[in-house]
Amino acid sequence: MRRIMLAAAVTVIGTGLAACGSTSSSSPSTASSGKASTASCSNSSIQKDLYTKGVLTVATDNPVYTPWFVNNKPSDDKGYESAVAYAIAAQLGFKPSQVVWVTEPFSSSYAPGPKKFDFDINEISYTPQRAQAVTFSNSYYDVQQAIVALKGSPVVTHHTAADLKNYLYGDQVGTTGLTYITNNIQPTQQPRVFDTLAEASAALEAHRIQALVTDTPTAQYMAESQLKDALLVAQFPPVGEHYGLLFHLGNPLVNCVNHAIAALKSNGTLLALQRKYLQIYLKFPTVQP
């Protein structure tokens, strides 16, 4: 999923946004790791690899949330992931009007089989297990997980490593947050699993769970704008999680997309977008699970 091509970009991003996320991780893609030349990545050259000739078909979930998207409208080029998608499209020679958005639920995005899109951008973490069924691009964002609880909950005031094991958690099926709960927090109670993050959030509001875990930007948005009386309690230390664009297994288009991501790192575009949409997440404390 990740391979940094320019060490300078790693240094800049790592020092500027180390606490909230960067684009410095590397993971193997299941597609060819060969570098694509500028000529082979011209718009005319990649037409044969597109889902629909003449347009770039980009998938994400519905609903989508700030700061990744704004007003649940992926096509407006606002929010970090929307802006990244359009920046990649421009690198591949597409005009904004040639980017077509389609809906793909998170839970089915990494299932084996053909895809009805060129790539999916939806905070999808690279894992070796997922990479057996789909292909990931290099990283466009490295993230930390964070814990969300309601005001007045004991989670807010008592969140040492020992304390965290005693709470009832819930999360969306297949997410890094759920994996983090199980593998890192290791609570004494089995976490409750929901089909969507919205369902997990509703369970938190209804006091059917005491806390949920998700990436820091989403957690902050949920606490400040989506859920009544919720707080982002703290972040957890990085565990190597990073997001990549998702393709059908072996899609050759990933090589040119990786070329585009490398260019956006080297010219400062990704760093600028992180500072625009994600800089706020530096302020939250970090706790050990």
Listing of model-derived features with the role each one plays in the protein:
Residues A19-T30:
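Bacterial lipoprotein signal-peptidase II cleavage site
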Residues A36-D120:
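Extracytoplasmic small-molecule ligand-binding "clamshell" domains
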Residues N62, D142-A149, T216-A262, I280-P289:
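Periplasmic-binding protein-like
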Residues S82, Q91, S153, L168, ...:
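Extended ligand-binding regions for polar small-molecule ligands
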Residues S108, I124-A133, T182, E205-A206, ...:
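A ligand-binding cleft/hinge motif common to bilobed small-molecule-binding domains
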